[in-house]
Design a protein with these regions (language model features):
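N-terminal ligand-binding lobe of clamshell/alpha-beta domains
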Residues: 1-147
């Protein structure tokens, strides 16, 4: 992602290399997924339930943090999956971003009884740009706090 960002910003747009790109590269260079791999369902919408599927930036970010999302092999990037299938999939974690759908402690976790829920910043999970410098720390903290 960093090479592509530099290509677009510096070579494509003729801008100076932004300082946040250096900070983001440094932040992610130190990331090493430690401990056991978590297996997660990652909804991005409700009514209907939609989750991360194949080839997504957010899926790659989570993988770097030791979280494998269970629909990474789905033919669609954001498949619609019935809640009954999501809860039966065998996840040990549900990751609930606050965008594009705004999942909260009161809206989302209740659909996954008995499953720890990590409420994460959608900006840190899905946005290219300056937030990438803060993303490893912010997402790791949210994943560690999953209840």
């Amino acid at each position: 992602a960093f090479t592509e960002l530099e290509r677009v910003l510096v070579r494509g747009c003729g801008l100076a290399r932004p300082g946040w790109l250096d900070a983001a590269e440094a932040a992610w260079a130190d990331v090493r997924a430690g401990g056991p791999v978590r297996h997660a369902v990652v909804p991005v919408w409700r009514r209907p339930w939609m989750v991360l599927g194949r080839d997504t930036f957010a899926g790659d970010v989570l993988a770097r943090l030791g979280v494998r999302h269970l629909y990474s092999g789905h033919p669609e990037r954001y498949p619609r999956i019935p809640i009954q299938e999501l809860t039966a999939r065998g996840a040990d974690l549900v990751v609930l971003p606050d965008e594009p759908y705004r999942f909260t402690a009161d809206d989302g976790p209740e659909a996954f009884p008995g499953l720890p829920a990590a409420l994460v910043s959608g900006r840190h999970l899905t946005w290219y740009g300056p937030s990438l410098a803060e993303a490893p720390a912010a997402l790791t903290a949210a994943l560690s706090a999953a209840r």
